[in-house]
Amino acid sequence: AALYQADARAHVERLLGSGCLPVFCGGTGLYLKAALDEMDFPSGELEDDRRAGYQELAERIGEEELHALLAERDPESAAVIHPHNVRRVIRALEMHDDGISYAQQKSQFSVPREHYHALWFGLTRNREVLYERINLRVDLMFEQGLVDEVRGLMAQGLGDALTSMQAIGYKEIIDAFNGVMSMDEARELIKMRSRRYAKRQLSWFKRDDRIVWFDMDECTIDEVVEDILHRIEAA
C-alpha cells in the first residue's frame, strides 16, 4: 500500500498538472484510502531477513508465545489482533521495531483525513445478481487461462510461500496442483471466497459516509452518469 500510495499520488499530480481530472476505479478500500486520504506508512520495505526471523521464531515458540511477545512490547496492538493471526502479529512486531503502532495506524481508518478532496461514488445491486456475476467471472478466468498462468508462475519458482501467491485464485489452484483438492473443487472455492471478499468490500465502503451510492437495480447507467457529472460540475 505504501508503494501504491507513492505511485498513485505521482500520477495524480501529473494529471492535475496537465489539467485532467483523475478518476480512481476499483474495489480495494485500503489502496483507495492510501492514495486519497492521509495515511502514514513505514518508510521503505521491511527487511526480508527480519520477517524471516519472526517467522522462524513463531515456528519455534508457537503463535501464543509470539502474541505474548507482542503484548509485552505493544499491548495496545496485541489487544486488537487475534493470537492465531500470525501474519498480522508479525506485521505488528515489525512496525513496533520501526517505532509505529499497528493499533494507532489502524485507527486512521475510522476518521478519514483527506489528502485530496475527492468525490466518492459506489454502485450496488441485488446481492444474488452480484454473486451470480462473480461466479460467471470466475468461470471466465478459468476459460481465459488462469490455470496455465499459475502453472507458469510455479515453474518460475513462485510458490505458495509468497504473500502474492496467497491471493484468491492463485492459492486454490496451487492447492489443486499439490493434490489438496481437485481443480473443480478449487474453482468452487474461488467462487465462494470471491463472494465473501465482495461482501467484506461492501461492508468496508458502507462505513464511509462520503460515498454516494447508486442502486443499479433502480437506476440506468445513463441516469447514474448524468447524476455523477452534475455532482462533479457542482463541486
Predicted feature locations:
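Phosphate/pyrophosphate-binding catalytic cores of soluble transferases and nucleic-acid-acting enzymes
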Residues: A1-A235
